[in-house]
Amino acid sequence: MSNTVSLQFPDGSVREYDASMTGAALAESISKSLAKKAVAYAVDGTVRDLSDPLGASGKLEIITREDPRALELIRHDTAHVLAEAVQELFPGTQVTIGPVIENGFYYDFARNEPFTLDDLPVIEKKMREIIQRNKPFTKEVWSREKAKQVFSDKGESYKVELVDAIPAGQDLKIYYQGDWFDLCRGPHMASTGQIGNSFKLMKVAGAYWRGDANNPMLTRIYGTAFANDNDLQAYLHMLEEAEKRDHRRLGREMDLFHFQEEGPGVVFWHAKGWKMFQNLVSYMRRRLDSHGYQEVNTPQVLDKSLWETSGHWGWYRDNMFKVTVAGDDTDDDRVFALKPMNCPGHVQIFKHGLKSYRDLPIKLAEFGNVHRYEPSGALHGLMRVRGFTQDDAHIFCTEEQMAAECLHINDLILSVYKDFGFEEITIKLSTRPEKRVGSDELWDRAESVMMTVLEQIRQQSNNIKTGILPGEGAFYGPKFEYTLKDAIGREWQCGTTQVDFNLPERFGAFYIGADSEKKQPVMIHRAICGSMERFLGILIENFAGHMPLWFAPVQVVVATITSDADEYAKEAAAKLKAAGLQVVTDLRNEKINYKVREHSLQKVPVILVCGKREAEEKTVNMRRLGSRDQESMTLDEAIARLCEEATPPDLLRLKNAG
């Protein structure tokens, strides 16, 4: 083995170093200021401890706090400090696992008395003391026997179980920070002092060990950490905004929907909420029709044999709702399942009747009700449910048509998002996973086509970010994932485009090619909203309940100041309704400020106020949600203006084009 390694620097230059040299020494050899800023280093993208020897040649990167990758290290190290603080303050508490998660970290603890929110300030204070000690992170590699013995002697039974679960031949790494240590894969920064003070413990929750309800209940402490105070405060402000916009609270205030114990994870839509849902369906239906889709509908309940053929029974059975019918009146004991997906049903429709290459592409769309079992702890309002509606579509095409169809789908997806005000979109290509069906040659062709499509999208759209997710594709083909950013900076993965060579083959779907031979079609799975319930939840939070006029379930309230205006208010409401607007009248004997405040809480976009004077002059006072201003105008002028504003964006484009 060579004693030297060749390292390529970011500027392209290549230098040789002794293989035993550490990352810290290398950083110092470049400059002392860089050595002070360094928190880790990477070779060929693999992040390593500064104390690790270089070992191998490759592309070198010195990671500082400003590097996005440093954030994971900061959060990882903070989780370790949290665990040390807890054990200092509460002797006898067992530590289990403490991973980095999106926007922060958590650590699970086993303790007879669960932690409460009141404990968090005390723990935070101790954490800051530990960080101030600036103890170095040092790594040791232990034998399995030593690790089990040490943790067993400390009464850490969960750590012993974790040691047992580590595959044979894999190093057992132990990281020290002063005298305290933990089992960990690493990497870590150089010392606790590099963490800084830009962290906060957020909440406590219960969590079963290994996520299994048969195991003991642990206490999970969640926290977050950032590289600086500005980022931390921005995140905390975003959380405050998110709480104000929580669709569950707004759903109650706006009287849109509710959930109840008898139907966990399924939505009870109220009249206003269902109107909003239907607005979304109507909009999507028009968009699909204009893009050549045929809307279909497939059964909710199907025999398990179909799911066995599709592969869902083997891959997805535990997440499916099974249906059996037993009793004297039944003549069989067949097992059925509520459909978790619409795709097998669409293949059946494609197979019904002979198809020619001249018929392709065939685009089948469905607003399909599907059911998937989700653990009760994972359910979250409209965002995570057990029963939902997919805006599902499947395009059956030739391999040669695949690129053009993916581009057509992309144009439609981006157009829909833009109509709802989402301009910042990220598209990522997920490539072949380790477990997959189909030959490498087939995957090569599919990924090549989708890489070309992604490049075309990147060139056509300056505001679209793109990326690659290696190994994250579906088992049957590569896919695009569309992520949109909302009004407060949160990202939501919604749309997907997935290429599938597997399902048509499983079901024996074919078309007759130009050579009169049977050919297997490519099947492209496509969703824009994904779950329409979830998309509505995203919209409610994005707009904080203040929906665009064209989408609002109640667009206008006609409210009276005095009973002298009741008849005029009814007349005005009738004209507004005749013009196609969603209108409610409020003739109650209440003060107008009370009425305005109440309808504002329900996020009604426009309130038309009528008093005796307005009734005599055939005018209205228009008030907009979120504004204290009011504008007087004739009723006809108000109708004309509101009808223009209430025209859905797709219909407005058609109107303007005409």
Curated annotation (Swiss-Prot):
The keyword Metal-binding applies. Its EC number is 6.1.1.3. Coiled coil: none annotated. Its main location: cytoplasm. Binds 1 zinc ion per subunit. Keywords: Aminoacyl-tRNA synthetase, ATP-binding, Cytoplasm, Ligase, Metal-binding, Nucleotide-binding, Protein biosynthesis, RNA-binding, tRNA-binding, Zinc. Residues 246-548 are annotated as: Catalytic. Pfam families: HGTP_anticodon, TGS, tRNA-synt_2b, tRNA_SAD. It catalyses: tRNA(Thr) + L-threonine + ATP = L-threonyl-tRNA(Thr) + AMP + diphosphate + H(+). Its cofactor is Zn(2+). Zn(2+) binds at C343, H394, H525. It is found in: Cytoplasm. Catalyzes the attachment of threonine to tRNA(Thr) in a two-step reaction: L-threonine is first activated by ATP to form Thr-AMP and then transferred to the acceptor end of tRNA(Thr). Also edits incorrectly charged L-seryl-tRNA(Thr). Belongs to the class-II aminoacyl-tRNA synthetase family. PANTHER family: THREONINE--TRNA LIGASE, CHLOROPLASTIC_MITOCHONDRIAL 2, THREONINE-TRNA LIGASE. HAMAP family: Thr_tRNA_synth. Homodimer. This is Threonine--tRNA ligase. It comes from Brucella abortus (strain 2308).
